[in-house]
Curated annotation (Swiss-Prot):
One of its GO terms (biological process) is defense response to bacterium. This is Cupiennin-3a. It is found in: Secreted. It comes from Cupiennius salei. Signal peptide: none annotated. Disulfide bonds: none annotated.
Length: 27
């Protein structure tokens, strides 16, 4: 349903943000 899709997108977004944050800390 719509809820599961929203959860999936949320997890994807969190992963992307986490990756970018890790990159910034490494620099």
């Amino acid at each position: 349903g719509f809820g599961s899709l929203f959860k999936f997108l949320g997890k994807k977004l969190l992963k992307t943000v986490a990756k970018q944050a890790a990159k910034k800390q490494m620099e």
